[in-house]
A protein has these predicted regions:
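Charge-biased low-complexity segments
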Residues: 10-159
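C-terminal motif of bacterial Sec signal peptides marking the signal peptidase cleavage site
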Residues: 5-8
C-alpha cells in the first residue's frame, strides 16, 4: 500500500459530499486569495492586522517569503511529513489547515479546520509546526502584517 501526500493539488471543485462534510470552523474560500505559484502549490492567504481583522489585499506591497521560495516550502513539507506506515486500511481524503506567519516571520496559530482522521490531522499539524521562519509580509509604509494561510493536504491511497 502506498500513501500519496498531495500538497499541490489544484482541484477547486467540491463534491456534494465534501460540501456537506465541511466543519463549522471552515473558513469560506471568498475570504482567501490564491497564492500565485509556478509549482502548483494550492496555498491561499489573507492579510491580518494586529487585531486579527482582515486587511484589503490591495494594501499588500510584499508577500511573506519562505526561505528558498514556494518550491522549497513544498519540498520541506514532503521531507518532514511523517506518517505511520503500519496502517492497512485505504483512505482518501483531505486535511485543511491554517497557519499564520506573524510580523516576525514566525509560524503561529496552527489549526486543522477540516479533519480527515486523527492520525492524519496530527501528522499535518506536526509538519506545519516545524516550518522555519519566513520574511514577513508588508503593506504601505513598510509596515509588517500577519498573513493567514490556508493549506490543504490531499491523501490518495493506492494498492
Amino acid at each position: 500500500m502506498t500513501i500519496l501526500l498531495l500538497i499541490s493539488c489544484k482541484n477547486s471543485e467540491n463534491t456534494e459530499t465534501e460540501k456537506k462534510s465541511e466543519s463549522e470552523n471552515e473558513i469560506t474560500q471568498s475570504e482567501f486569495k490564491k497564492v500565485e505559484s509556478q509549482n502548483g502549490l494550492n496555498l491561499e492567504y489573507q492579510l491580518l492586522d494586529e487585531n486579527n481583522e482582515q486587511i484589503k489585499f490591495s494594501s499588500l506591497t510584499k508577500m511573506p517569503e519562505f526561505p528558498g521560495g514556494l518550491d522549497s516550502l513544498t519540498k520541506f513539507i514532503q521531507r518532514n511529513y511523517k506518517f505511520h506506515q503500519g496502517f492497512t486500511e485505504y483512505i482518501n481524503g483531505k486535511v485543511k489547515s491554517t497557519f499564520v506567519v506573524d510580523t516576525f516571520g514566525k509560524v503561529v496559530d496552527i489549526e486543522i479546520v477540516e479533519r480527515l482522521r486523527k492520525d492524519y490531522d496530527t501528522a499535518c499539524y506536526k509538519v506545519i509546526s516545524k516550518i522555519p521562519d519566513w520574511k514577513p509580509a508588508e503593506i504601505e509604509n513598510n509596515k509588517k502584517v500577519k498573513v493567514k494561510f490556508l493549506l490543504p493536504f490531499k491523501f490518495v491511497t493506492d494498492e
